[in-house]
UniProtKB/Swiss-Prot annotation:
One of its GO terms (cellular component) is cytoplasm. Its main location: cytoplasm. The keyword Metal-binding applies. HAMAP family: Thr_dehydrog. One of its GO terms (biological process) is L-threonine catabolic process to glycine. Homotetramer. This is L-threonine 3-dehydrogenase. Its cofactor is Zn(2+). It is found in: Cytoplasm. NCBIfam families: PRK05396.1, tdh. Zn(2+) 2 binds at C94, C97, C100, C108. Its EC number is 1.1.1.103.
Length: 345
């Protein structure tokens, strides 16, 4: 089959046409991929950064954001039938650790990542356990279904705390950050402020519904807070940037008793003024992936109740033009990039 493969321990990803079709175990489902999306993780793997070198075995079929149709099911699978439109949870969990057995699979100690530690979805076919397959309702378009993985990250992070009537700060205007901003507005936050230094992505945040999108290299965040009538600080902070300076500023402008969810990963150790956390009585929560499968149910419910994410998909290419997709992702001048397998030449 055709697939995008991390074939060498160097910068790049390569199209190969002779990749073996994955085998289907008795509890597995084979999905014929129709559309894929490029994740920031895929860009890290493309760049072959320090994390990728330590994490990804080579060769590896990459990718974990997709939508497709069931092609084949294993002998013991009863919940799915060929032809059904589906996506899949990208974290394969063990099922036996304490957290898995308690229903907290997103906290599994032995998580294996699709397209990172096991063959992924930048391929004509991907095989995952039936437990990881999620059926997509007919009223959700393919382009949105293909980004359920990062949409799930945004949902898990944003809905970590009650947002109704709250003032929310989102640090980082990448695709997940701007989707989190849209979610916060959808569920009833008062002011949603997004910070970044990338004007393209700040404009995207505005189109996704942010009250204010602030370039902190040019504007004073506290002045913006005053303009909005905020007197005591933000009630909820969502750290999506992985930038130490952004996190430190977030802590400075949080209200006493505020709540902070962190999805962004810092590149290395960062100095933090922990007195901000202690004396303000802040709550911090780390977020990894999606709650299985409460996050998925909430994603569908929000889309079916009017949440509009269409603006976050900014570029579309045929899978044969994947290099253009990676180039625009690496430029920082994009939202989500979707690759169409049906448009292959």
């Amino acid at each position: 089959m055709k697939a995008l493969v991390k074939a060498k321990r160097e910068e790049g990803i390569w199209m190969q046409h002779d990749v073996p079709v994955p085998e289907v175990g008795v509890h597995d489902v084979m999905i014929k991929v129709t559309k894929s999306a490029i994740c920031g993780t895929d860009v890290h793997i493309y760049n072959w950064d320090e994390w990728s070198q330590k994490t990804v075995p080579v060769p590896m079929v990459v990718g974990h954001e997709y939508v497709g149709r069931v092609e084949k099911v294993g002998a013991e699978v009863e919940a799915f039938r060929p032809g059904e439109r589906v996506s899949g949870e990208g974290h394969v969990t063990c099922g036996f650790c304490r957290n898995c057995r308690a229903g907290r699979r997103h906290l599994c100690r032995h998580t294996v990542g699709v397209g990172v530690n096991r063959p992924g979805s930048f391929a004509e076919y991907v095989v995952i356990p039936a437990d990881n397959v999620y059926r997509i309702p007919d009223d959700i378009p393919d382009d949105i279904a293909a980004i359920f993985d990062p949409f799930g990250n945004a949902t898990h992070t944003a809905l970590s705390f009650d947002l109704v009537g709250e003032d929310v700060l989102v640090t980082g205007a990448g695709p997940i950050g701007v989707m989190a901003a849209a979610i916060a507005r959808h569920v009833g936050a008062r002011h949603v402020v997004v910070t970044d230094v990338n004007d393209y992505r700040l404009d995207l945040a505005r189109r996704m519904g942010a009250s204010r999108a602030v370039n902190v290299a040019k504007e004073d965040l506290r002045a913006v807070m005053s303009e909005l009538g905020m007197r005591e600080g933000f009630d909820v902070g969502l750290e999506m940037s992985g930038n130490g300076r952004a996190f430190r500023q977030l802590l400075e402008v949080m209200n006493h008793g505020g709540k902070v969810a962190l999805l962004g990963i810092m590149a290395g150790p960062e100095p933090v003024d922990w007195s901000q956390v202690v004396f303000k009585g802040l709550q911090l929560k780390g977020v990894y992936g999606r709650e299985m499968y409460e996050t998925w149910y909430k994603m569908v419910a929000m889309l079916q109740s009017g949440l509009d994410l269409s603006a976050v998909v900014t570029h579309r290419f045929s899978i044969d033009d994947f290099q253009q997709g990676f180039d625009v992702m690496r430029s920082g001048r994009s939202g989500k990039v979707v690759l169409d397998w049906g448009a292959a030449r």
